[in-house]
């Protein structure tokens, strides 16, 4: 939800100013449900179909892209061709890409104006080579250079086949794009940057999704963890056993499991919770790391 929620208020404001806003998202049904109050055109974004492959820990931005499909040239070609076809259909004047490097590469090939927005994770420092994803690890420069080379050897042949210019560095994914680093300095994945403007997080939350809060006081606990998380059930069981008033947002949980897990002191929502309300009703949030929710709660104290 975080990626779409970063785009939603911007799309709303652009539409208010008379722009025609077109969304391209992988899950059209879910996107339409989340954007149901707004009259947007929603297109199906290209979906990665790279075959499964074991990868080592993603220690750089390029390694993360490779493990998510960029290693497979045919899938990457299909991705870029899909975006180019989508641009031909939508005829955009500008592309606003939120953690969408393939869309940026396709827009680069098509010569379309583009804006790259995101958190520190999705907008890395544009150095050559790029730094490691885990600042607490010290990676040899030769490893960083090797990661860049591996990425370029996978991507550049595909770009050339499509008639696009090759990249000289991984940072060229963002070449020509206006960059909007939408986070706080304290939450930047790569640590504080002195040469970049921090625009702050995009705070957006559904206003019409009311949760059932067990306590009328501000002593509830808000949990935002997906059911597939390995500690999900242990956390729910512990909260129930301790009798702590809690609300859990568990996207993807079945109705049967919801009924089985709920208790007198614990309610579970299958739909996004109004986080601004949650910030006034809870004293603690347990989350698996969502940037939007974490930033909102921290700013609320």
Regions found by a protein language model. Give the residues of each.
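A short, glycine/small-residue-rich beta-strand->loop->alpha-helix junction that serves as a flexible
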Residues: 1-8, 228
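Donor-nucleotide binding loops and adjacent catalytic segments primarily
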Residues: 11, 191-282
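Conserved nucleotide-sugar phosphate-binding/catalytic loop shared by glycosyltransferases and other
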Residues: 16-17, 21-72
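Conserved nucleotide-sugar donor-binding subdomain of glycosyltransferases
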Residues: 57-102, 143-170
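Conserved nucleotide-sugar donor-interacting segment of glycosyltransferase catalytic cores
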Residues: 77-142
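A donor-sugar binding/catalytic signature common to diverse glycosyltransferases
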Residues: 93-99, 124, 272-301
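Active-site-proximal region of nucleotide-activated glycan assembly enzymes
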Residues: 113-190, 194-196
């Amino acid at each position: 939800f975080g990626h779409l929620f970063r785009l939603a208020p911007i799309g709303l404001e652009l539409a208010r100013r008379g722009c025609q806003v077109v969304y391209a998202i992988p899950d059209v049904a879910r996107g339409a449900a989340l954007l149901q109050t707004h009259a947007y055109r929603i297109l199906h974004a290209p979906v990665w179909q790279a075959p499964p492959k074991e990868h080592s820990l993603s220690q750089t931005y390029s390694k993360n892209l490779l493990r998510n499909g960029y290693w497979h040239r045919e899938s990457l070609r299909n991705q870029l061709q899909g975006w180019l076809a989508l641009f031909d259909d939508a005829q955009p004047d500008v592309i606003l890409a939120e953690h969408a490097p393939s869309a940026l590469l396709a827009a680069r090939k098509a010569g379309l104006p583009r804006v790259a927005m995101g958190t520190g994770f999705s907008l890395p420092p544009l150095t050559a080579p790029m730094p490691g994803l885990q600042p607490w690890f010290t990676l040899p420069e030769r490893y960083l250079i090797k990661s860049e080379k591996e990425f370029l050897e996978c991507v550049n042949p595909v770009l050339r086949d499509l008639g696009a210019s090759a990249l000289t560095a991984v940072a060229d994914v963002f070449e020509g794009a206006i960059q909007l680093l939408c986070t706080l300095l304290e939450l930047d994945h790569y640590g504080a940057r002195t040469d970049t403007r921090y625009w702050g997080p995009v705070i957006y939350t559904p206003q019409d999704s009311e949760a059932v809060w067990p306590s009328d006081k501000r002593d509830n606990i808000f949990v935002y963890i997906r059911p597939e998380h390995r500690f999900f059930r242990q956390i729910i069981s512990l909260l129930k056993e301790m009798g702590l008033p809690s609300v859990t947002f568990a996207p993807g949980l079945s109705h049967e499991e919801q009924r089985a897990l709920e208790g007198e002191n614990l309610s579970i929502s299958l739909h996004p919770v109004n986080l601004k309300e949650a910030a006034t009703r809870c004293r603690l949030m347990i989350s698996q790391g969502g940037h939007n929710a974490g930033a909102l709660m921290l700013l609320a104290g």
